Amino acid sequence: LSHGPKEKKESDQVDNVGSAEDSKTSKSESDYLINLNNLAKEKKIDSLIGRKLEVERKIQILSRRTKNNPLLVGESGVGKTAIAEGMACLINEGKVPEIIKDTTVYALDIAALIAGTKYRGDFEKRLKAVISFLKKQNKPILFIDEIHTIIGAGSASGGSMDVSNLLKPALARGEIRCIGSTTFQEYRGIFNQNQALSRRFQKIDVNEPNFDDCMEIISGLKPIYESYHNVNFSNESIQAAIELSSKYMNDRFLPDKAIDVIDETGSMLNIERNNNKKVNVQKKHIEKTISKITKIPEQSITAADKKSLKALEENLKRVIFGQNHAVETLSNAIKLSRVGLR
């Protein structure tokens, strides 16, 4: 009997602590969602340039009655996020069909959604509130970047209830339209393993753009970087950025790596300037930036391809002895590859 009141007192303290924690961690749905339409109005999202086929397919999927959820799958840096966020820009500019003209695009912040969910049921409560909020909106579109992260996110130890399982019913009924993005590796290894979730999405392959598409994309973004760095980019410098980044930065993909080269070149010239006059970016400046990024000497980057290819077999035989047949086969393969025959 002597321990009864004490136990009650301790339990009261625990309840009070729990309620205090709940009051601290309680947030509105807007804290977990980012309104991309508002960001587009404030010019905080770059306009979508090119990618006509991918945009058309995405709009077709969004206009379906059910399973109207496009999934953008492509390598890192090919522009998946730009295609998804660019939808908000297209809506604001009125460049979309009537059926999705009045829609609002929201980006889900999964980190904020999970942060602070200490007790079982906190996470589910938050996500249910977000889903309920979206259902009340006029034609909402939910964008989840790196969508493979929702599988297992927020699940308690030993539990199977995560973001993906809570979203499935709303996605199946078409109550919420969702745009997802992920890489080929994550799609095959994680996302596609969850068949119940993956069949609710329609896959759109986002491949690396070719040279002409890259020129169109970067030429469209050129005024933004010129204004930011107070420089002028010539077509020759943009062409050099695409060609040299494609040649020497093999671990990354266009257009991201070419845009990075353009951005860093503008930054370099902006730092080195002695006055406020606009600097004209030339091919040599692009070559200097590529050299710094890849650690390849500028002389190697600026060397003429024709001369180096012409003397390739001879130069290899000078340093490799007793392997003439292998050297000839290798040099022939390189020459064929360079002219686009293999």
Predicted regions and their residues:
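AAA+ P-loop NTPase nucleotide-binding core of proteostasis motors
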Residues: 1-342
